[in-house]
Amino acid sequence: MAAERVFISPAKYVQGKNVITKIANYLEGIGNKTVVIADEIVWKIAGHTIVNELKKGNIAAEEVVFSGEASRNEVERIANIARKAEAAIVIGVGGGKTLDTAKAVADELDAYIVIVPTAASTDAPTSALSVIYSDDGVFESYRFYKKNPDLVLVDTKIIANAPPRLLASGIADALATWVEARSVIKSGGKTMAGGIPTIAAEAIAEKCEQTLFKYGKLAYESVKAKVVTPALEAVVEANTLLSGLGFESGGLAAAHAIHNGFTALEGEIHHLTHGEKVAFGTLVQLALEEHSQQEIERYIELYLSLDLPVTLEDIKLKDASREDILKVAKAATAEGETIHNAFNVTADDVADAIFAADQYAKAYKEKHRK
């Protein structure tokens, strides 16, 4: 008996300039008590605007300052505040950890969840999972939910004013979507959605990649100028919606496993963003598979145009020994890691691919960057 095809997605996705000013319209009839979660910086950027708009729509808002860590203690602390406020709606505003915490709080309360990302830096906003850390920021577990967010609200004016590095990181995270989904589909592997990929997820993942190669560089320059352009709108949708649906229902493989493998090492690498590490992981996955030089160099060229890392030196591992890289490879091939969705490889194979990807990128840089 073949496995079931499963596709999951948020109930509603809204993207555009100044959409946070319409938040009350989207919540009409759902509830009149909310809890709004944002960190101190994001309160200034978007939090207060959201609360003011809710009040105009006769919706009460309990304001919570997020501590900075998506930990069980923080989830419990905010869930207690939300219970006392009798909140039927949880609104998370900000970056990945804030949004992951908001999802967990809504799950505790069985509440309606609204996600408002302030950067297009990862594909996490649309997903039905959170990454939970210890209070000290050490990865603990994935927490899966029975449903995706009820509403994802992406204000491109806010995204255009976020640091360009965050958009580039989101593009890197999203570029892994098709590379990974394609390999999971080919091998008949499982996805985060709990089944095999659908034709819909395959089409979305492929369109994600096409959009990023077409508009990625233009969107990056738009954010440098702090302006909203058609190219930025296209890339924000690719980074957030297309990549979010594509990774969850299309499948994760080696690129994200290698990203997770890097946690086995200490040092400067941890100052890199999620997407920056995934960029290198994607090159490693391409090196693990049979791809032409032209195909691999297409990715290297786009990464370099977005100031993304492509070599071990770029990800602060210039002096890493084979022993160090084997540690990464062993962690990337640990039981339950996503690499097994698409590959039957050993840690040794992965270590070889890491050194190969590094060499391919170094050679490309020498040839083209003089």
Swiss-Prot record:
One of its GO terms (cellular component) is cytosol. Its EC number is 1.1.1.6. Its cofactor is Zn(2+). The keyword Zinc applies. Zn(2+) binds at residues 173, 256, 274. NAD(+) binds at residues 39, 96-97, 118, 121, 127, 129, 133. Keywords: Glycerol metabolism, Metal-binding, NAD, Oxidoreductase, Zinc. Binds 1 zinc ion per subunit. Optimum pH is 6.0-8.5. GO terms for molecular function: glycerol dehydrogenase (NAD+) activity; metal ion binding. It holds the Pfam family Fe-ADH. The keyword Acetylation does not apply. InterPro entries: ADH_Fe/GldA, ADH_Fe_CS, Glycerol_DH. Changing residue 305 to C: No effect on affinity for substrates. Gene3D superfamilies: 3.40.50.1970, Dehydroquinate synthase-like - alpha domain. PANTHER family: GLYCEROL DEHYDROGENASE, GLYCEROL DEHYDROGENASE 1. Catalyzes the NAD-dependent oxidation of glycerol to dihydroxyacetone (glycerone). Allows microorganisms to utilize glycerol as a source of carbon under anaerobic conditions. Is also able to use various diols as substrates, such as propan-1,2-diol, butan-2,3-diol, ethan-1,2-diol, and 3-mercapto-1,2-dihydroxypropane. Homooctamer. NCBIfam families: PRK09423.1 (NF006941). This is Glycerol dehydrogenase. The gene is gldA.
